[in-house]
Amino acid sequence: TTPDDHFNTFVVYAGVTRDVAPAVYLQLPESYTSNQVLIKLLDKALEGLPNQPTFTEMMQNGITLGQLRQLLKTKEIVDVLEKIGIDTGALGQLIKVIDKLPAVGDNLRIAVGVPNRAGAYSVTAITDNKNYNVGVGVGALVLKADKAKLVWKQDIGKKISAANAKTADFAAELQMNGTAVSDQSSVHVLYSGLTSKWKVYSSTTTPPTEPGRYVMTAVVLGGNYQAAPITRSFQITK
């Protein structure tokens, strides 16, 4: 190769997030995503095809493997790519790489871009240049969860009246550098204890309001953040 050689690189990230959910990402070359002329040509070629999103919609919402296969079989699309010097052979190799992933079917949704969720991924890079054979390289990527901190949203003290318990905010929230993170879906709270009538109380959704003694624990399960659990005990009085 020479310093003047230009290669487009497609990257496939496939793996499992911290939520144990499968995830596949396709990173397109900048020559695709920043070329407004190319995007308009591809959008126009795709507009007339049934059940096929435009290229702009694919970049925003992702694409299923079935749609990607159909895309590469469409003559109008292949013609557009070849006219501007894009090696469609590399795109065929891209399909082969994705086909080798476990449990792959046409309904597999592929996100366009790079992984944005903590997890472990295999990485396959595919380069293209019409003057060279298609190159394929394989590696691995681990995205670690950001370290955050769990805090109680309201200090209820050691004792709280039954009347105040009905309006108190028992929730916990994740914070980074003192600011609540936007996604709180991984925060879970367990309430347990005994009412004053010796009735066992346990819930993961509803805080207690009857007089008694209770313990509550907040934990983070999955998601893009990790934080140590927090626990507090309190008494609800009449």
Residue ranges and their predicted role:
Residues 1-238:
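Solvent-exposed beta-strand/loop surfaces, strongest in extracytoplasmic domains of secreted
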